[in-house]
Amino acid sequence: MKLKTGLNLTALLLFMISVAFPAQADTQKMYGIRGDNLSIATQMPAPRTYSVKGQTYTTKSGNEAKSYIKEGLASYYHLKFDGRKTASGDVYNSKQFTAAHKTLPINSYALVTNLHNNRKVIVRINDRGPFSDKRLIDLSHAAAKEIGLISRGIGQVRIEALHVAKNGNLSGAATKTLAKQAKTQEAADRLVLKSNTLFDNTSKSINALKGTEFYCLKMLELTSRSQANKLITQLALANIQTEVNRSGNKYEIYIGPFDDKTKMAQVRTKLQKMANNKPLIVYTYKN
């Protein structure tokens, strides 16, 4: 009886842990981007005001934090800071993918793109700073190395906010970029997408249908742009947007949005047959 009770308590504890912490993500496998494993759910505390060197800062919360996109200068921590405490209470580790930002929530995440070479990294915000008018973010040594910032010391970057829910789903400004980087259906399914995520010029008629579910298709690993264009021509879709993008030495097709799940499924089946079952991802989002 005691053994059974102990097992039940262990099972309950494991369940509580699984609810409290999202599943870890291999960001390189899912999106082709190295970074933090996204294992800490983002909390949204009320905005807090603090002062450093006579300058006052107010932290972001709610939709303001989630929608954050900004371009500006980034640098990185000197190795001498290894082992020092950060604003979150963490000890700074130069080998981890972390960063300091003045106003984004602690334990939220950011997708950082080096605008010089388009290399990307995902970091967890665990510190405050940099307290300089010129720099937006300071990266850990590992994060700076990943995007090729070490030799330059400082560089122009784009910062896109990313939040992690307790169930592991991802939301925020960075989901638009991650959607185009997704390598698997699982990676796409973790993204909480808005109607304009994959296409910048979605039709006004689609945008008007608030609260409706829409679907987009992405076919991966096509060998050439001509192959992608040939498939689009063969599909002969009327009033459905298509787009061809290069991904490394391969090409991808984006098709949609569809407001009819049956129509989307028909196009998906036809496309897979024509392309000999190349990898295909279905995106679902709500307007």
Swiss-Prot record:
Coiled coil region boundaries: none
Keyword terms, alphabetized: Cell wall biogenesis/degradation, Lyase, Signal
Signal peptide extent: 1-25
A molecular function (GO) term: lytic endotransglycosylase activity
Function: Lytic transglycosylase with a strong preference for naked glycan strands that lack stem peptides.
Entry-linked Pfam families: DPBB_1 (PF03330), SPOR (PF05036)
Matches recorded under CDD domains: DPBB_RlpA-like
Lineage: Bacteria, Pseudomonadati, Pseudomonadota, Gammaproteobacteria, Pasteurellales
PANTHER family: ENDOLYTIC PEPTIDOGLYCAN TRANSGLYCOSYLASE RLPA (PTHR34183:SF1)
PROSITE patterns: SPOR (PS51724)
Name of this protein: Endolytic peptidoglycan transglycosylase RlpA
